Amino acid sequence: MSGLFVSFEGVDGVGKTTQVERLRAYLEAQGRTVVVTREPGGTALGKAIRQLLLHGVDGGAVDIAPRAEALLFAADRAQHVAETIRPALERGEVVITDRYLDSSLAYQAGGRELTPEEIRSLSMWATNNLLPDRTYLLDMDPALSHNRLEHAEDRMESAGSDFQSRTRQAFLDLAAAEPNRFRVIDASQSIEAVWAAIESDIKELA
């Protein structure tokens, strides 16, 4: 049985974690072996990088520069693919990741004003050109999704409404450019309605 690679994308607070777990349970009930992971932080190296990306450097008076941030995301992703994602796919397993390279494109190119070409080139090099078979973009107005957050804001979440709005639009632009890979789902619906859309689609892949 061939491996299957699925990613979930969207601004913070849209319900990705909930739907990742629903999909895991569904696929395991179908007899598939499922690996659930996330970016940043899907490996030991990634966890250390995640702390830097989300909370900054202890004692650092200056925020992480956009190019440095892009390289940190790429380092996390390169290790993630080499250590976790590609080996699981080669074993014929399903990999579900909460964020992948599209988050870099949306948050860094859309939100941080680096060019999409720069970020995509770096990400594709880091992953050795590995793209998901399916990407579910859970879409919602950031003003609504922000109210759903149940934890203290991290560095990305506190970047402001303009940043979040640019990021949302960047995600939608990515989905429009790759309609065969993306499925855009209205995340303002109920959890059950969002899951129903995912379940209907995944049956064609799994």
UniProtKB/Swiss-Prot annotation:
It catalyses: dTMP + ATP = dTDP + ADP. One of its GO terms (cellular component) is cytosol. The keyword Nucleotide-binding applies. Its EC number is 2.7.4.9. It comes from the Bacteria. It is an enzyme of class 2 (transferase). GO terms for biological process: dTDP biosynthetic process; dTTP biosynthetic process; dUDP biosynthetic process. It holds the Pfam family Thymidylate_kin. The keyword Kinase applies. Keywords: ATP-binding, Kinase, Nucleotide biosynthesis, Nucleotide-binding, Transferase. PROSITE patterns: THYMIDYLATE_KINASE (PS01331). One of its GO terms (molecular function) is dTMP kinase activity. Phosphorylation of dTMP to form dTDP in both de novo and salvage pathways of dTTP synthesis. Belongs to the thymidylate kinase family. This is Thymidylate kinase.
